[in-house]
UniProtKB/Swiss-Prot annotation:
Transmembrane segments: 231-251, 259-279, 303-323, 339-359, 381-401, 431-451, 492-512
Protein name: Frizzled and smoothened-like protein N
Residues of the signal peptide: 1-24
Gene name of this polypeptide: fslN
Residue intervals annotated with topology Extracellular: 25-230, 280-302, 360-380, 452-491
Disulfide bonds, paired cysteine numbers: 31-98, 40-91, 82-125, 114-184, 118-170
Predominant location: membrane
Amino acid sequence: MKMKMKILLIFLKFFFLKKLFVNSLDIGSKCEILNPISMCSNYLGYKNIYLPYGYTQEIIEANVTATLTNPMGFSAIPDLICKENIIKLFCISTYRECNSNINGISFPLPSNPCQKNCFKVLETCVPFLSFFQGFSCQQNDTDGKDLYPITENYYNLTSYGGSSNQSIQCSNPNQGSTNTTVSCVYPLVYVSTDDIKNGEKFHEVMPNCVLPCPLYVYTDKQYDAKFYTEVVFYCVSATIAVYLILTFGLIQNKITHRSWIIIYLGFTVLALCASYATQQYGNGDFRCSSQPGRYRSSQDGNCMLTGFFFQMGGLGTIFMLSLYSFDFFLTINMKTNKYFLQTSIGVWALIFFFALLPIKHYESTIDSAGCWIGEYNNRFWLYFCFYIPAYIVTFLMVIFITSSIYKVFKMTVLFKSINDRRILFLNLRSVTFLLVILFCISFTSMYPLYVSYNGEVFYDAIEKWVYCLLEKGNDQCPRIQFSRFGLRYMNAFCMSIIGILLLFGLGIDPHIATIYRESERFNYLLHLVGIKWGNTPVPSKKSSTSSNSSGSSGEKTRETRKTRGQSISLKKIDQSNSNSNSNEIESSSIDKQPSSILNNHNNNDDKQSQA
């Protein structure tokens, strides 16, 4: 299809310009009466035509007929007004008006088309001017005369016995439309130049003609698959996020470092789900504004809100998962983060900073479902506010996970010596969870970069579709089909299941039952409805304090804990005086965190509290 359009352009340029560049001073030229059956007869206001030496009407008419009847010629132009003016200019350029009986010379001179005829083409064929590379109304012939004079051309004929300043009027037939309204082939939308220059979010494919909104670039089946996947998984993820926030934020007696990170993750996942919910709210396609052809941008409040939530949720989740992997790394190495509060404040400050900074640059695109940082004009905001911080944090996450895997591998001998494979299983489960979620966030952060640097694939699909519209019309052109839908679907899938992964990695564990059983608030609520489960039904103010340990709470649990028939006594680090006691502390603290995050620095925190 693209090749056909190129052939059309060759036809246009060749037949437009071939006759125009013939030498105007041709002593062998002659005048003839135009054959009335010529296809150009209705476009000329004269019958006396100019024939250069060596040409006959039959030769010229054969070329005219081939051009005007060829499906890849002028007939491919869908706009009738533009087509009429182009054919008129073509005819008066091919069959130029002949001027004979000029004083002092024996050969005729042609009249070139008046410049206003050329301007009519420029005015009425704006959407197609990009196809006429090099075409101008200020061209000259081989004698240096204007191809499209304003009123007349002047010739020095003294060498032939004529005047030194012979004027020849230009041809200006009355036929042809003077309507200068630009018409865009359906379904392209006409937009004024001022609107486009004002920075409105249009996708201009030809001068003043933009892509419609919405523009569907996948099949209905593909859109449905993506839609139902996102609806189900985002709803489930939002529910899980609320569950994690309630469990580790309200139900648990003492909030540990690890609990705070899980709460943070719950809020970032909720922000991601809120972004999806915002774009699904209301009627019509979220990408489109009320103005035809204009895609939403930050000047639309709901687009700004959606972009903010998406940036908060996406980048925030990456930051918090990196913080979680750092906490896991410290726990494996029996250390604690003494500056956890400052770290948390700093991370949240960065998240808000990178979400608010591009607040005026959120926009929707052809391929997007909602709004995010646009790269329509430049990519600075996308790189500075997402790619650079996301990739730096992801790289740190890889380092923490790799170091933790190595530590777990080294501790395998210890796990075997105490004959408790459950500990090894729990830690391997944590590592597996981190690796899977690392893959998801890496894929979702790399996919937009892949699209940016492979945009030609998508632009080519749009270009072929536009060429088809110009050649055949909308009814004969199939829907645009972007390739690599599998990657697009995988990106949506990985993003929507973050909450579900958090459930399997953090929210399903025997330790959760202990949290609910020992929770004073939860048991108090059960007591109000007549259910007795656990120990203390009345909440105390003391239980609401926060702990900087990564393990769970409860003085009873600190003294002794039973795990699948095996009881391990916990002792303070400062009370251990032998290697056996040290091993007992290490094994007990490892087993104390059934969610598979080792809890050895619990004892360090107790020691610090005693001091």
